[in-house]
Regions:
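ATP-dependent carboxylate activation and anion-phosphoryl transfer catalytic cores
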Residues: 1-142
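Short glycine-rich anion-binding loops that position phosphate/pyrophosphate groups of nucleotides
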Residues: 47, 151-153, 218-222
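Glycine-rich phosphate/diphosphate-binding loops that line cofactor/substrate pockets in enzymes
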Residues: 134-146, 165, 205-211
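Surface-exposed amphipathic alpha-helices with a cationic face
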Residues: 161-167, 183, 231, 235
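Peripheral docking tails and interdomain loops at the edges
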Residues: 193-194, 202-272
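Short internal beta-strands
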Residues: 169-181
Length: 272
């Protein structure tokens, strides 16, 4: 939801150019990355991916069926494909096996760790995100303590996020560096020790059921050690862990709406 219209148009252009230049017949999977408003191609694969079921549902187009027909000689023009804009936001939420494999680190890397996906579908981002969380077996809390620890590059952006959590009734607990910048910007928060700094530390608070949500964007070797300890405790006590600023923003929107205000429709009702 944070891509500009210009960026989306450029991605569409690059996709079309790559598909034509590579003489693609059937499906093609392209992974893009964006940094400092520049778009990069990570890899291109002449195959389907797990994204196909997702986009087939949100567009109401059986892409796998059409790809098979193209592969055996049909032309795209013969299939009469039409773009559908239904005015909904779709959130794809990965499902991780962390509760089954507690030794796995909850913080992500290029390595594939998810074992499935669910979709949250709504006209508003907050509602779509909340539905995706529920579908993945997680219910976002409506009150309690939010633990925040972010790296230096995220500290300016975390200010408005912490302020929003205060506004919707959460108390803030933060590590020393994050706590300092929040207090300096008029956001009341309590300081807590990192792992290895003293006791009680953040892991102790998690085990004492004193934490409702964790926002942690680690960077560096010591932070990675902390993340492992925090993540392991969070899995054990079923506490949501948010590892990006954009994820924290979406969580706030979802909590503002609340699970009781969600409405549900089948895909058949949406696309009729």
């Amino acid at each position: 939801y944070n891509l500009s219209l210009k960026a989306k148009k450029m991605i569409e252009k690059y996709t079309k150019n790559l598909a034509l230049e590579l003489n693609t017949i059937g499906l093609i999977n392209i992974q893009f990355a964006m940094k400092n408003n520049k778009i990069y191609v990570i890899e291109v694969n002449p195959r389907a991916s797990r994204t196909i079921p997702f986009i087939s549902k949100i567009k109401d187009i059986p892409f796998a069926k059409y790809a098979a027909q193209v592969s055996v000689g049909k032309k795209l023009m013969e299939l009469n494909l039409k773009e559908k804009n239904i005015g909904f936001i779709a959130v794809k939420k990965p499902v991780f096996p962390f509760n089954k494999f507690p030794e796995q680190k909850v913080f992500l890397s290029p390595e594939m760790k998810s074992t499935g996906e669910v979709i949250g579908f709504d006209k508003h981002l907050g509602s779509a995100y909340a539905k995706a969380e529920l579908g993945a077996g997680a219910e976002l809390p409506q009150k309690g303590n939010v633990f925040i620890s972010v790296n230096d590059s995220d500290k300016n952006e975390i200010i408005h996020i912490a302020r929003d959590f205060n506004e919707i009734g959460f108390d803030i607990i933060a590590t020393s560096g994050t706590s300092e910048i929040l207090n300096n910007n008029g956001i009341k928060c309590n300081n807590i020790f990192k792992v290895g700094e003293g006791r009680p530390n953040i892991v102790d608070s998690i085990k004492n059921n004193e934490i409702s949500i964790i926002i942690n964007t680690p960077l560096g070797e010591q932070s990675r050690y902390d993340e492992y300890k925090i993540g392991k405790a969070a899995i054990q006590f079923k506490i949501p862990v948010i590892t990006t600023i954009s994820g924290a923003t979406a969580v706030i929107r979802a909590i503002r709406i609340g699970n009781k205000k969600l409405t549900y429709s089948s895909l058949q009702e949406i696309f009729k």
